[in-house]
Swiss-Prot record:
This is Ribosome maturation factor RimP. Required for maturation of 30S ribosomal subunits. Belongs to the RimP family. GO terms for biological process: ribosomal small subunit assembly; translation. The keyword Aminoacyl-tRNA synthetase does not apply. The keyword Cytoplasm applies. Keywords: Cytoplasm, Ribosome biogenesis. Its main location: cytoplasm. The gene is rimP. InterPro entries: Ribosome_maturation_RimP (IPR003728), RimP_C (IPR028998), RimP_C_sf (IPR036847), RimP_N (IPR028989), RimP_N_sf (IPR035956). GO terms for cellular component: cytosol. It comes from the Bacteria. It is found in: Cytoplasm. It holds the Pfam family DUF150_C.
Length: 153
C-alpha cells in the first residue's frame, strides 16, 4: 500500500473517531525522522485542544490501529493540535482562515521573493490572493511549497 493510500484509508477510519470525541481531524502524516517512523494525527476544535483531548483521541485511535494493523513497520503514534502557526493543507483550511495573516513559502522566487506574508483575501484551485501592505498579490498555487497561518496571540 502506498503512503498516500495508507493516509487516505486512515483518514476514513479516524475521522469518525475524532468527531465522536468532538474533534475535527485536521491532518494525518506518516513520516520518517532519523531511524524512527511517526504517525502524526492533528486534531482541532472550536474550543481548542487540551492534553486530555489528545489522550482520549490517542487511546481510541491506538485501539483501532491495533485492530486493523495497517502499518507493518514499527512507529510512534502522536496526537496533537496543529498549533497556532498551523500549516493550511486544504481548501477547507483556507476558507476558515480568510481574513487572517498567512505566510506563503514558494519553490522559486517571484519578483525576487521566495516568501510572502499578508492577509488571505481569496483563493481558487489555481491561485491564492493575499494583501501585502495595500496591494493584492496573486500567487499561483503550483509555486507554493507551504501555506502557514501566521500565529498571532
Amino acid at each position: 500500500m502506498s503512503k498516500h493510500s495508507l493516509i487516505e484509508n486512515l483518514k476514513e477510519q479516524i475521522e469518525p473517531i475524532a468527531e465522536g470525541l468532538d474533534y475535527e481531524l485536521y491532518h494525518i502524516e506518516f513520516v520518517k525522522e532519523g531511524k524512527e517512523n511517526y504517525l502524526r494525527i492533528y486534531i482541532d476544535s472550536e474550543n481548542g485542544v487540551s492534553l486530555e483531548g489528545c489522550e482520549k483521541v490517542s487511546r481510541a485511535v491506538s485501539e483501532l490501529l491495533d485492530d486493523i494493523d495497517p502499518i507493518q513497520e514499527s512507529y510512534y503514534l502522536e496526537v496533537s493540535s496543529p498549533g497556532i502557526d498551523r500549516v493550511l493543507y486544504t481548501d477547507k483550511h483556507l476558507e476558515k482562515y480568510k481574513g487572517y495573516n498567512i505566510v506563503l513559502n514558494l519553490y522559486s522566487a517571484i519578483d525576487k521573493k521566495k516568501k510572502y506574508e499578508g492577509e488571505l483575501v481569496d483563493f481558487n484551485e489555481n491561485e491564492i490572493d493575499i494583501k501585502v501592505e495595500e496591494n493584492i498579490v496573486t500567487i499561483p498555487r503550483e509555486k507554493i511549497s507551504k501555506t502557514t497561518l501566521k500565529g498571532e496571540l
